[in-house]
Amino acid sequence: MALQSVYYDTLLPEEVISLMEKDLQVFDDHLEDSRVGGGEGGVVEENVRDAKNTWIPDTHWSAGFIWHYVMKANRENFLYDITNIQGSTMQYTVYGEGQFYNWHQDLGISGFYKPNVLPGQCDPQSNATDFITRETEYIRKLSFSLQLSDGDEYEGGQFQLLDETGKIYTAPKRRGTLILFDARASHRVRKVRNGTRKSIVGWIVGPRWK
């Protein structure tokens, strides 16, 4: 299914997704409490996000597999100017019973660049240099979530997106479903009532909007 701000692909090969889930089990020993806010300033806020996650380098074969479908979806639906997976890493996320992630955006106003200038001071050249050295000319444009668990393996845990009219879209729970959406779209993972929900999520960056 393709909309202006969201794209679902439910036709990824089951045998590849099954192999991916098995191969990623080596990362289970590295799971930590998920944080909100991102970067070095991320904090654990279980009233907002209660889950476990770790990071997968984009040198892992799963990243190349996912990137193929990201490019396919972008070509067929978004046509955004994109470059790569942010930070050269993907997030391996696990939700157990009672865990969830409330409504949020992957690119909100708080995520935009703020020059390091003291109040009352203005140094355009310094600002420009700081802007470039921090690589802030790239921003999140697309987000993706690949479902590794089958819908029969857990209850609840629906992935949902919210449009500007307040309408909620619920993504399929089928294993191998790739959900690709505009990083500015509000989304959530509802509370898992039973079982375990596993996924790979990541963010696709590109030149800042003009």
PLM features: what roles do these ranges have?
Residues 1-178, 184-210:
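Fe(II)/2-oxoglutarate oxygenase catalytic core
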